[in-house]
UniProtKB/Swiss-Prot annotation:
Its main location: cytoplasm. It is found in: Cytoplasm. It comes from Vibrio campbellii (strain ATCC BAA-1116). Belongs to the pole-localizer TmaR family. Keywords: Coiled coil, Cytoplasm. This is Pole-localizer protein TmaR. Pole-localizer protein involved in the regulation of several cellular processes. It comes from the Bacteria.
Length: 104
């Protein structure tokens, strides 16, 4: 019985470490994107530009990123719906299997 608890404990620890690793990878990816964004901004800004031109570039970039965020939110909703549909189908199949097995 204690080995079962140890297995469960180790599995939970492994899952926690996996989540931490994914979270850390996300932070690395996000910071790399910030570096790329700043490099792109430096490419667009020229010494002869006015303040208004620089602000216009930044506003345009902001709008582009907001559109991307919206696209990702929509994609996440679609993925979540697909996961719910799959979970529902698995429950249905499990129930069918239980009913079929119970009749034998």
């Amino acid at each position: 019985m204690s080995s079962v608890f140890e297995i469960v404990n180790q599995a939970r620890r492994k899952n926690k470490l996996k989540r931490e690793l994914l979270d850390n990878e996300k932070k690395v990816r996000d910071n790399r994107k910030r570096v790329d964004l700043l490099e792109n901004l430096l490419d667009y800004i020229k010494p002869e530009m006015t303040h208004d031109e620089i602000v216009a570039i930044i506003k345009n970039m902001k709008a582009d990123y907001e559109d991307r965020v919206d696209d990702h939110i929509i994609k996440s909703a679609e993925i979540s719906k697909a996961r719910r549909d799959i979970s529902r189908r698995i429950r249905e199949l499990t129930e069918e299997d239980k009913q079929t097995s119970g009749k034998k």
